[in-house]
A protein has these predicted regions:
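N-terminal helix-cap/turn-to-beta initiation motif at the start of protein domains
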Residues: 41-50, 70-73
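Short beta-strand segments of immunoglobulin-like
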Residues: 232-238
């Protein structure tokens, strides 16, 4: 377990194989999308993974994984939980409200030290949830890039796909994305996650709120083409009435062009431009 504790308590490590933050956007099969469809949970190349997951909860991280990340692992004796959910609100562990006092033994960057015996954290030193779910990769995703998206996990988690380590993430309130193209396969796949209530990041995620844990926002997979928009920044100048877009395209060989379309609230085209990676309209 020392290797795991070293990971959780290392402030210089807050992500492993985790994709960089980006502006929210999703690939679509359509060139035109209605204004009311620009929502976080809508996308043509998306596979929702909310709903029933298998769960094993413990008050402290266990020394070995027990092979729970392996596709053949028998999870029939585990509980079932509907995600997204806060574990404490589902009956696993104790919800803790604290203002300025850390709910664990304060010794930065460590979170596994022994607190006073009358603290909840004395018995629940670092509550840990192990999650498993099976999903079938859509046939039309064959040959495309596949990303797993966790919209919110508190406070840290390790991820496996089909028994292979896919990455690690901290930052409870931001999404975590992992490129799992080389890990998924046609047909059934198994995703497994081990989530920890406390990590070195807990020292920054503090003050005046309920201390909860788990996969508390949506989980889904999505697919992009081999050439895809990785990020974009859009700025508007009200004085000149122009919009400028800076677009980061991955694996672009220059053979494709970009098109920028600005629509008014009714959906009508107000301006458009096409060309290279920097567009103005």
């Amino acid at each position: 377990m020392s290797e795991l504790i070293d990971l959780l308590e290392n402030p210089s490590v807050f992500g492993i194989s985790k994709l960089p933050p980006r502006a929210t956007s999703w690939p679509s099969k359509r060139l035109s999308i209605a204004p009311d469809e620009f929502l976080y949970d809508i996308g043509d190349w998306r596979l929702p993974l909310d709903g029933p997951w298998k769960l094993h909860w413990s008050p402290v991280p266990e020394e070995e994984t027990g092979g729970f990340e392996a596709p053949a692992f028998d999870d029939s004796g585990w509980d079932e939980i509907e995600l997204p959910a806060n574990l404490e609100c589902a009956g696993y562990g104790t919800p803790i409200y604290s203002n300025i006092t850390y709910p664990f033994h304060c010794d930065p960057p460590h979170v596994m030290g022994e607190p006073p015996e009358n603290w909840t954290a004395w018995a629940e030193r670092n509550p840990t949830g192990r999650f498993r779910r099976r999903f079938v990769l859509p046939e039309e995703w064959r040959g495309r890039r596949v990303v797993l998206h966790f919209a919110g996990v508190q406070t840290a988690f390790r991820l496996w796909v089909n028994g292979v380590f896919a990455g690690y993430s901290e930052d409870s309130m931001g999404p975590a994305e992992f490129d799992v193209t080389t890990l998924v396969r046609a047909g059934e796949n198994v995703v497994a996650a081990e989530c920890y209530k406390y990590s070195s990041a807990s020292y920054l995620e503090d003050q005046d709120f309920w201390r909860l844990s788990g996969i508390f926002r949506s989980v889904f997979a999505y697919s992009t083409a081999e050439v895809f928009i990785a990020d974009a920044a859009v700025t508007a100048d009200p004085e000149s009435g122009t919009v400028r877009a800076e677009v980061e395209v991955e694996r672009w060989d220059g053979s494709l062009s970009l098109e920028l379309v600005v629509r008014d609230p009714s959906g009508a085209i107000a301006a458009q431009a096409s060309g290279g990676r920097s567009l103005a309209a």
